[in-house]
Curated annotation (Swiss-Prot):
Signal peptide: none annotated. The keyword Lyase does not apply. It comes from Gluconobacter oxydans (strain 621H). Belongs to the IF-1 family. SUPFAM superfamilies: Nucleic acid-binding proteins (SSF50249). Residues 1-72 form the S1-like domain. It holds the Pfam family eIF-1a. It comes from the Bacteria. Keywords: Cytoplasm, Initiation factor, Protein biosynthesis, RNA-binding, rRNA-binding. This is Translation initiation factor IF-1. One of its GO terms (cellular component) is cytosol. CDD domains: S1_IF1 (cd04451). One of the essential components for the initiation of protein synthesis. Stabilizes the binding of IF-2 and IF-3 on the 30S subunit to which N-formylmethionyl-tRNA(fMet) subsequently binds. Helps modulate mRNA selection, yielding the 30S pre-initiation complex (PIC). Upon addition of the 50S ribosomal subunit IF-1, IF-2 and IF-3 are released leaving the mature 70S translation initiation complex.
Amino acid sequence: MSKEDLIEFTGTVMELLPNAMFRVTLDNEHTILAHTSGKMRKNRIRVLAGDRVNVEMTPYDLSKGRITFRFK
C-alpha cells in the first residue's frame, strides 16, 4: 500500500489503553483505536489524554489507525 492510499484525520486522544493503544475521537465525531507510529516510538514522543493528533487510516479498516503527529 502506498502513501497515497492513506486517509489522514485530526482528532483528540480520549483514553490511554494497554499496549500503547489509544482511543481517539476524530473531528467528524467517529471514535477509533490507534497506535503510535514507529518514528514516534523511536523518538519517545509521549501522547497523553487530551492531546490533538494526526491519524492515518487505510480505506480498508476505518476503525483503526496510526498516530503520526502530536500537535503542541
